[in-house]
A protein has these predicted regions:
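Conserved ABC transporter NBD signature motif
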Residues: 65-76
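P-loop NTP-binding/switch modules centered on Walker-like glycine-rich loops
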Residues: 43, 57, 178, 182, ...
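A short, flexible loop at the N-terminus of ABC-type nucleotide-binding domains that lies
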Residues: 2-5, 14-27, 58-63, 81-84, ...
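Charged, flexible cofactor/metal-binding loops and thiol motifs
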Residues: 239-341
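Conserved ABC ATPase "signature" region
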Residues: 75-76, 127-147, 256-257
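A short, proline-enriched helix->beta-strand linker immediately N-terminal to the Walker B motif
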Residues: 171-175
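Conserved ABC ATPase signature
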Residues: 151-156, 160
Length: 341
């Protein structure tokens, strides 16, 4: 069995606050192979972005407690010095943030910002960095890149700024790209263009991608494997086909039930998940989803509120739920029938 390119084991990220310790990520484990895309999906506050900022080493050490293990190509990132992390960021691993306008400096041209990353990690001259910036703008589909390289962020449209951010992230050919909801603020046409761009660039460079989103439709388009997060924990894992076609966790059923489908009748109402996400300052005991779950009675007793269900994986597939496999199959059949009728 080959060693995964990225391995995260029992990751815990807790933040200190005036009111206590916020358990933003609490015991998360996953692997990512070379050239593959892992989609991490969940509601706001589920721990998606916190996880990936921990991988990049971007949490403030004075207010954050991080435990566990993060291995990137065999290197322990949690044991790395800040100088070593600075060498890795932008070079071996990079991130595309959600709001490109807020991430780009308004005082510098697009070309200078892309070239600065290239110069920092390669020692290239200004002329070489400018040529590389034009090359990357060409790769991400910016028209007239030799002219637009001297434009400022406000002169780019939203989709073009996101393309520029992708160009900046890939300028040093990183092996790992973390995309934090990069299509959320874009219209659906530009979203599709950005998704196609990421897939094309992945095929060209062999990049491993972590794609963070709350949109299962986006996951269906780009991911190879899917990790569903809730309340700082993984509640379901599997391939894209397994998670989207035969989900095993009630939370995943809820996410799917809250989305419209093209195949089903138009008069079937969407089914929102009741309640609100848990406070990670004082999270529920047992299964963190149990206060919002419709199946606690089927489990029986107080098991859901008293015991945290294990995430038992078989060939990378599993869900953290006390329902038996037979119950999951039965309830999912009912759920799928409701969606189709």
């Amino acid at each position: 069995m080959s060693t995964p390119f990225l391995s995260v084991r029992d990751l815990r990220v807790h933040f200190s606050s005036e009111d206590g310790m916020v358990k933003a990520v609490d015991g998360l484990s996953f692997d990512l192979d070379r050239g593959k895309t892992l989609g991490i999906v969940g509601e706001s506050g589920s721990g998606k972005s916190v996880t990936n900022l921990a991988i990049l080493g971007l949490h403030h050490p004075d207010h954050t407690e991080i435990e566990g293990e993060i291995l990137l190509d065999g290197q322990d990132l949690l044991a790395a010095s800040e100088r070593e992390l600075e060498r890795l960021r932008g070079n071996k691993m990079a991130m595309v943030f959600q709001d490109a306008l807020a991430s780009l400096s308004p005082y510098h041209t697009i070309g200078k910002q892309i070239g600065e990353t290239f110069r920092k990690h390669t020692g290239a001259s200004k002329q070489e960095a400018r040529a590389r910036a034009i090359e990357m703008l060409t790769k991400v589909g910016i028209p007239q890149p030799n002219l637009r390289v001297d434009d400022y962020p406000h002169q780019f449209s939203g989709g073009m700024r996101q393309r520029a951010m992708i160009a900046m992230s890939l300028v040093c050919d990183p092996a790992l790209l973390i995309a934090d909801e990069p299509t959320t603020a874009l219209d659906v046409t530009v979203q599709a263009q950005i998704m196609d761009l990421l897939k094309d660039l992945q095929q060209e460079f062999g990049t491993s991608i972590i794609f963070i989103t709350h949109d299962l439709g986006v996951i269906a388009d780009i991911a190879d494997d899917v990790l569903v997060m809730y309340g700082g924990r993984c509640v379901e894992r599997g391939t894209k086909k397994e998670v989207l076609r035969t989900p095993q966790h009630p939370y995943t059923w809820g996410l799917l039930g809250s989305m419209p489908t093209l195949e089903g009748p138009v008069d079937v109402p969407l089914s929102p998940i009741p309640g609100t996400p848990p406070s990670l300052l004082n999270p529920p005991t047992g299964c963190r989803f149990h206060p919002r779950c419709s199946f606690t009675e089927q489990v029986g007793g107080d098991r859901c509120s008293a015991q945290q269900p294990p995430l038992d994986l078989v060939s990378g597939r599993g869900a953290a739920c006390h329902l038996t496999p037979e119950q999951r199959a039965e309830f999912f059949t009912d759920f799928a029938g409701t969606r189709a009728n």
